[in-house]
């Protein structure tokens, strides 16, 4: 039916753009030109007339997106044609979105109209500036009717229908992140039982900003928040209102810098319901000028937990301000149930209560003990200064490491680094060009090109519309680079817009879910791997004895009478020699290379010769060739090889030809040696040049056969081995020999050198006067030791099975890169179940068959796009593929297999991750409550305050109402005049004498030590990973609806998991919000600013204070015990003295 529909498809009338079947858009929506009323009426009337002619029995409905409540021009024109018009708003609080209630009404109305009759046609129109909203609504309709899949791909397809600049002209902020979020709401309509779900009232507690963006030019910003939405206390009023607006002159408005803090928490405590617009605005130094930082639009009914984590690619930002946000920036919006009243943390200041506390008069003697000691100036606090320096250095280092590649500084660093790499590469190439000429491969060049392409802007999704439509776009930009009012979005056409380069587009998070499989760290490729692979494949496969593709190398022949003989057969057969030996046959076994014209001397050396067609019993020594001997005229063609050969008096090994002249050797590179002869059995003899001089002139080689496609026509063909040699010894090797003998031996996987470098031992070995004689190898022993085929005793004794043993081994076809395929097979060797059963277990989410480590390894070896195309294009026998290729084919049978594996990995680790995170959050919560609830610690802090005021009485530091938390550690810095006691020892002494019940206060802080080992930053990352992972699970659950039967069990098991996991994550997010409040309240408890003194610093300082306090108390006890023993000893000594005195 699709083919017939395409064949009979009719073009839409001029002025309409077809989005899908029976859904059209007026092309005036895709331009910024404003038609006059009369021209507009003519334009619409012409389109309506063509529609009536093309669809005579059709009914039409028009969806119009307008601004305001006044009557639109489209409505006034279409009243003459008796058409149904439905008006919708053009935006929602300045955002090119509509509320979920309006979107649902639009989708149901459009679907009902199109299903009512096949003659019904839907027309879409928007007023000037409404194209972003219209594009979002059309994408929603396509996803709702399941005509397209994938939110980003669908929205991108719609935006491509208009010029690329149109979206930026009509929307100062990039609306794609929020639009994609709402499209995901629509795609998830089958996850729950009811869609859209009922709105839930929540309380937006706070917003946490991690890694402060730079909006003031000094590495910081001054953020304030505004919230728009429906009032949850007025259910009858559905209009949006300003629910929260932070006053510009309030104490909560302050400047935050990246060097001071990584996390900023801003309390809001605003009740929300339904569709919510959250705006973050930064104020100028005058607290009047406003600039939009980011905007987030969401719906409370679709929040699956009480935390909404957004990274840099999931917020609406100005088109030219993406680089102001750090790469790892994130905004955490924390919610709580509206009905659950949140108890505010009470802050008890130490100076407010003086019951059971030592007064300042109790430390009257402390001024005498520490009269010459002074406390450090609190303004020059060393501990705080050092900590701030360390924190600033760490933040700066992280900012540099995670900087955006699009920022000018990071771009310059990258360019300089690339230049250094290029210079080093050039230097290495120039040094190694002689020894390793083939250091690059097409695969590496392709990888390099792809890596450079990745630096291009991946965010441009809007392309220019086809010029044949006659659309004219008037691109007018203002010079303003900033938006000073967040409400200016309501009139985007006339708003001042930021300048933006053509390469900047939507944020990078549009493709953030596409992840490639992580590698195993294999970054090195063997040198000359391509040639090595070719050699192995050539030598391992049985070579055909046909000589049609190889020119032959003819041996020197004697002056015997020529005798007609039949042509040599393609398959050599044993021939017995009965003739007597000939004296002239002594030189018949020393072949010379074929003659080549002198003009080839300037060309590069030819490629290495192929391996011999048959396996050799002897190992001939390499001989150098010369191109300078081609000086005589062409001799007569050689005779065909005779059937009968004569015994050779000398060795049958090839003799090296005479060396070329020195002048020629100095100007040309020596070509590779010729291959060994085809059949040779005798041992090598000493090569001599006199035998070559006695031989007749060498006949020219015959014309080579046509080259294959892979050969270069400019490079001369490589000479091949001779067809036969005279001598009786060679005939013994031909007996019982099949196609090839070398295939029965295991290969030696060396890295072959294609040319000998001058001065190396290989070049010296090729000289005739220094040629080394290779030892004789027993081939039968080699076959017995290194045979590639297992030879059993039965097969050796049974001659009938010899042919079966000699059958060549079936070669496996390798399509995947060798090293990756090898590593993949190692990974598969640890999986003890067949591949089909493995994938069935993955789709069933069966954790008993495969563990998380194996799932992660499967993710690493998911086929890439190039590998998938390579496997899909393979048309041969799939049984001949290697195990890695077979594994990849099994993976390709499952749609989005990598995403499903990641979902499986998340499911396996979910419960352990939730348990660990909950344990850490409970530890922090317990530690904060224990510190704030310890009455003994509070009395000790007040005692320290009295001690400090006693010491600083009469000075500027006196009469303090409190002290900084890090001052606790300075109690050990102030020593007495005799340096035998510190303030900490004195404090313990006084408490032991007057308030001994406070000495065991560390027992109240049992969770403090465990809390010092936990960082809120890591807990936040874990919480974000769990929330994001659950979102990916929901997305895959939605996308798997169209997979068919293969994902049936996957969806069923995943739905059960989601029913449990969503409740767990919601509870965990609520605990996370509570713990965050407790951590901030702990800093406030000691009068500190949570933004400057984080929770980690508070608990670390308290733990150090407890440890020093306990140690000082123990030292005091030891000192008291020592003094007591010394007093007893002195008393005994006195008694002894008195006794002696009395005796005298």
UniProtKB/Swiss-Prot annotation:
The name this protein goes by in its record: Formin-like protein 18
SUPFAM superfamilies: (Phosphotyrosine protein) phosphatases II (SSF52799), C2 domain (Calcium/lipid-binding domain, CaLB) (SSF49562), Formin homology 2 domain (FH2 domain) (SSF101447)
Gene3D superfamilies linked: 2.60.40.1110, Formin, FH2 domain, Protein tyrosine phosphatase superfamily
Residue ranges constituting the FH2 domain according to the UniProt record: 735-1135
Family recorded in the similarity comment: Belongs to the formin-like family. Class-II subfamily.
Gene responsible for this protein: FH18
Active site: 126 (phosphocysteine intermediate)
Protein's organism: Arabidopsis thaliana
Name of one Pfam family that matches: PTEN_C2
Region (Disordered): 429-463, 482-729
Domain of life: Eukaryota
Sorted UniProt keywords: Hydrolase, Protein phosphatase
